[in-house]
Amino acid sequence: MKVLLIFLFSLPFLFKVSSQDIVGLTKEGNRLESVPDENAAFNKFKEILKLQPTNIYSLNKCSELCSRIGKRQTNNKVINDYYVAAKTYAGIALKIDPNNAESNCVMAIALGRSSLNKSGKEKILSAREIKVYVDRSIKNDPQNFKAWHVLGRWNYELGNLNFIERTAAKLLYGSIPEGSLKKAIVAFEKSNTISNGFILNYFELAKAYNKNDEKDKAIYTINKMLLIPNHTEDDPAIKEDARRLLQDIK
């Protein structure tokens, strides 16, 4: 009885310590991501999930980081493993809260990344699924700049399906999701108005401007982007791609 009472009285302290641990680990995970050291950040957020498997913030972070880290890999199996993990983390978060804006956004990101190298048929199937998640994300948080970026990419990719892909999709499904370059530009611009430090979004917006024959806007966007400090491990490579695009435009 005495042992039981000691245990019961100690429970609030144990929960308090656990909560403090999670707050500290979250701060450290965010710090590592901002360094940026994305592998270390990923491991830190996984530590949180060991303590609290239903921590939605950490599930979302693990999903997003897996999508980013996976994209930089060179081995196809490793790439696929990261993308599967990204979808798994997002899926767990969505089971906890189906309307969580960030969870829907990171699921859309994971699906988008994993469909980049797929065939036309698979790309169309993924496109339908991505649109569901990105629409739900924006509906629940209209200020989610990453979701607007994904919507821009969705429109850009669908608007650029070649004739064979579009014809095959129509034969298979009767219709295909409608995407357009102009809608892509609107979504990318919206993302920039919410967060003006998202380097990938600047690059994709510049590409869209260039494809839409708005050369001056593309050049201005790239030059502005090159002045923004790097925030992710992908940013240096994105800037190099942007410099090459700038030379091509000029």
Task: Indicate residue ranges for each PLM-predicted region.
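Short coil/linker segments at helix-helix boundaries
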Residues: 32-40, 65-99, 106-143, 153-191, ...
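Generic helix N-cap/helix-start motif at coil->alpha-helix transitions
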Residues: 20-25, 165-166, 197-199
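Bacterial Sec-dependent N-terminal signal peptides
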Residues: 1-25
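C-terminal/domain-terminus segments
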Residues: 199-237
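N-terminal leader/linker segments that initiate helical-solenoid repeat arrays
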Residues: 16-71
